[in-house]
């Protein structure tokens, strides 16, 4: 069985970069990233590995909602200037890169789902909890910095909803980190309580008459914003990848087919 280690490139690199005292010390960054990748390979023993990078195009999410991720700090100039050399170094280590047009998240999600559907195992290396929506038994998420898998049960307990309701929760309460708006006046706790009672957004919005007038008014007025927020939070899992698995092979394995689903 194929085991694909999928690394969220900038999520890993920027966290490592932030811990380097001298922001111009790209040699130290290269060494630390190389060490991290070597450790990831040693710990997980994948058959395949890829590191996925964000691109420069404006994402479809930002086109849909211009405030999406508004206020995010730009990449530090030394890192921006040294990124290509770092990517080349990783290629020399036989860690293949995949370059997204805009956000890496949708490419990572697509690759993970396609791997799982092909009876393989996908391990996403990222601290971004947005990947927790990929509810498939063959997909897991590894936090390199805490050296542990994402604990879905603990996350469910923290959020107060089941995994299948994570997107509904973000649709109602938003996501401040990504500037996903949600419905004005509906916070995470009240959103979780609503989902405990009504289970899903369609059921909730068809049951507003069962709520108090004030809360029902908020939800009715915010219905379209909830739909927008859901769409912004939901990862795309059906992008055409057009990659050949042999280009990302770590160890000898049986011949692979090309992933090229439209």
Curated annotation (Swiss-Prot):
Disulfide bridges in this chain: none
Binding-site list for Mg(2+): 105
UniProt-listed SMART domains: 53EXOc, HhH2
Binding annotation for K(+): 172-173, 181, 183, 186
Superkingdom classification of source: Bacteria
Cofactor(s) this protein cannot do without: Mg(2+); K(+)
EC number: 3.1.-.-
5'-3' exonuclease domain ranges (all copies): 162-254
Interaction with DNA, as annotated region: 185-190
GO biological process: DNA replication, Okazaki fragment processing
InterPro entries: 5-3_exonucl_a-hlix_arch_N (IPR020046), 5-3_exonuclease (IPR002421), 5-3_exonuclease_C_sf (IPR036279), DNA_polI_H3TH (IPR020045), FEN (IPR038969), HhH2 (IPR008918), PIN-like_dom_sf (IPR029060), Xni (IPR022895)
Record text on cofactor binding: Binds 2 Mg(2+) per subunit. Only one magnesium ion has a direct interaction with the protein, the other interactions are indirect. Binds 1 K(+) per subunit. The potassium ion strongly increases the affinity for DNA.
Matches recorded under CDD domains: H3TH_53EXO, PIN_53EXO
Molecular function GO labels: 5'-3' exonuclease activity; 5'-flap endonuclease activity; DNA binding; magnesium ion binding; potassium ion binding
EC category name: hydrolase
Keywords from the named record: DNA-binding, Endonuclease, Hydrolase, Magnesium, Metal-binding, Nuclease, Potassium
Family (UniProt): Belongs to the Xni family.
UniProt function note: Has flap endonuclease activity. During DNA replication, flap endonucleases cleave the 5'-overhanging flap structure that is generated by displacement synthesis when DNA polymerase encounters the 5'-end of a downstream Okazaki fragment.
Descriptive protein name: Flap endonuclease Xni
